[in-house]
Every structure is written in structure tokens, then in C-alpha cells.
Amino acid sequence: MKISIKTVFLTALAILVIAQPVFAQENETTEHKHYQFTLEDCIRFAFANSYDRKSMELNTESQQVSYDQSRESRMPSVSASASENFSNNKNGSSFSGNANLGAAVVIYQGGNINKTIEQNRLSLERSNMQLQQYDDQLSVQILQSFLTALGYNELLHYQEVMLKSSREQMKQGRTRYKVGSILESDMLLLEAQYISDSSNIVETRIKLDNSILSLKVLLSMDPLDNLQIIQPNTDNLDDLAASLPTEEYAIEMAMETYPTLKLSQYDILLAENNISMAKTGYKPSITANASIGTGHIDFDNLGQQFSDRFSQSAGISLNIPIYSRGQTKASVKRSKIALEQAQLDYEQTQFDVRQTVSVAYHNVVSAYNSYKASELKENAYSKSYNAYEVQFQYGKITTVDLLQQQNNYLNVLNDFIQNKYSLVLQRKVLDIYMGKEITL
């Protein structure tokens, strides 16, 4: 059978038309999102998408359910039942039925119900504080990763400027070598410096990409999504030092708001409540109950039967614990030991928090001093390097002198950038200890 070229063409065209939606769908599935985030955006995104945080939120919801249910335990319980039976024997067959409605309520249980409600309320508040603690820890991790990426991004900018300068120096060196004004070794040094600067840029880009990837992990973001961080204004960091409170005030604020300390306080309250709950085992309990019911045998005069068989009952019961084989006594002792342990942990936590905040405070002071020293040094080396560039253009200094000054400037610049973002990190960490939100 002979197939025309036109038939082949139309068949191929039809296949392409049919396949186009499939290709489009595949393209849609491979598209990735693009984000431009400030630090605050990163923190909000992480709070909304962190799987660990969602798990903690579910635990808090479960605690809320337990608390709500325990409050309902003050109410009476009500139940109803109904049955219908059929029997058959040599004397004949018969039907019988019963219906009952009953209620029971705890009148007194040694305060156990109220203590259980209080226990669940404290557990709920503690769960919320655990969530706050997690948020603070996650915020610090995001801050550190974000600032690391900013540092590499800023360093990359300066390195690209230096690479442009190295490129011009290399071109000038080749020109001057051709006319015999410099040695071949000097020209090769300039070319080697250009290659070295290019390599530094590649390494910094790799470090920047890795820091962005680490940030994506903290944000629970798809690693294939595109994330660009927005550079905040960091031109004048003196305000960070100007707004620094006294060390005593920083410690005082941390003692009032720090989640780890709050959790220790809740542990003490829970332990105290556990003692009260354990002691209820010594006390009697009183419950009351009431019920109504009716029934029938066969279906003759059904209404009259319901009336005749209608019954009511009510009662009250008293349960007095006499001897529980030492279980209640042991429970009280264990609860008291747990309270002593909670109080000891609280004292240790107080000490740790004071030490931690004090160290954080002095880290800020040290970071600021390092930043100011490196800022002055960077300004001096920048001016010196610019002067060396001009002198090199006029042939007043050697290539070795120029490259030595350039490398010195790059080292000083790298220290300046590290000290700059270290100051921001240390200051914001102190803010978190003091219960403040992170902003840049």
C-alpha cells in the first residue's frame, strides 16, 4: 500500500495537536515558584509551612479538646435504653419490651474534677508556650541562615567589582608588556590574579547557593523553587548599639518573657496540682443517680401497660476509701518528689537564662567593637588600594605591590562583612531573649 507524503504530514500534525495538552501539562508540573523574601517574609513562610510546627499545633489542638472535655465533666451523664423481646414455647408466643432513661452526676469527688480541669488548662498553656519556644528557635536559625546568605551576596558584589578591575589591569598589563614597559613575569602575575579573582567568585557563588538551600530547608520550601532574599538597609548599624539597653534590663526582660523559663514555671504549677490530685484519693466521693422506665407484655392495652409499669427511682451513693494498699500514699510522695525536681530545674533554668543573656549581651558589645574597628580598617584599605591603582596606571609601583595591596584589601573587606553581619545576628538574638520580634 502506497502512503502519500501528505498523509504522513497530516498524521504527524494530528499527533502533535493531540500531544500538545500532555506536553503543556508536563510543563506545568515542572514549573517552580519564585519568591522574593525579606527576613520577616521568611519567618512567616516557615511558620505557615513547617511540618514540625504543624505537628505542635495539632498537639495544642488536642490539649484544647482535653481541656474542653474536662470542663464538661461537671455536667451529669444521661443515657437511654430500649429493648423488645420475642419468646415462643409450648404455651404460645409473647412479646415484651422495656424503655429506660437514666442520669447520674458526681456531687463530690474530693475536688478531683476541678483539679483535672486545672491540669488540662495548665497543659494547654504549656503547649502554647512550647510552640512559642519553637518559634523563637526557628527564628534564630532562619536569621542566621538569612544573614549568612546576605554576607555572601555582599561579598560577591565586591568580588565582581574587583574582577572588573583585575580584568582592566590584565589588559593594561598586556599592552604595557607589548611596548616593553613591564616584564613578562609582571604580566603573568596580573593574569594569574584575574584567574584567582574569577575562582573566588565561583567559590562565593557556591557558598551563596548552599546558604540559600539551607534557608529553604528551614522554610520547608521546595529546593527547586527560586528564592531571592531582599537586602535590608545595613548602611548605618550604629543604631543597634545606640538602642542597646543595659545588661540588667536585658536580663530582667528575659526573666519575664523567655519561653524556656516559662515552661519551667508551668512544670512547677503542674507538679503542685498533681499533689492535690493525688490527695483526692484520701477523700470520699458522692454520686447521685435517677431513672425512669416502663415496659409491656404483648400488645393488649399497650397504653395502660405503659402507665401501670411506669417506675421512677433515685439514689445516692457514698464511697469512702479506707485502705488502698499504700497506692494513694505512694502517689502523693511521687508527686512531691516531682515538685522538688521541678523547683530544682526552675532554679537551674533561671541561672542558665541569666548566664545566656549575659553572654549574649557581651557578644553584642564585642561584635560592635569588632565592627567599628573593621569599618575603619576597610575605609583605610579601600582608599589605599584606590591610590595604588592610580600609581600603577602611571607606572610608579610594581605589579607585586599592587597585587599585595589588593589581596590585603580583600582580606580586610571579608573581615568587615563578617563582623557587620555578626553584629546584626548577635543584636537580634538578644532581642529574641528579651521577647521582641525579629525585624531588619
PLM features per residue range, with description:
Residues 2, 7, 26, 137-253, ...:
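Periplasmic alpha-helical coiled-coil/stalk elements that build and connect Gram-negative outer-membrane
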Residues 2-6, 25-32, 40, 223, ...:
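Acidic, low-complexity, intrinsically disordered peripheral segments
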Residues 15-23:
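C-terminal segment of classical bacterial N-terminal signal peptides
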Residues 24-79, 223, 229-269, 438:
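Bacterial Sec-pathway N-terminal export signals of envelope proteins
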Residues 54, 77-94, 107-133, 262, ...:
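Small/polar (Gly/Ser/Thr/Ala-rich) solvent-exposed segments
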Residues 54-73, 114-175, 192-199, 206, ...:
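Extended amphipathic coiled-coil alpha-helical segments
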Residues 97-103, 250, 312-318:
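Hydrophobic, lipid-facing positions within transmembrane beta-strands of outer-membrane proteins
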Residues 177-181, 392-396, 433:
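A short glycine-centered flexible hinge/capping loop motif at secondary-structure junctions
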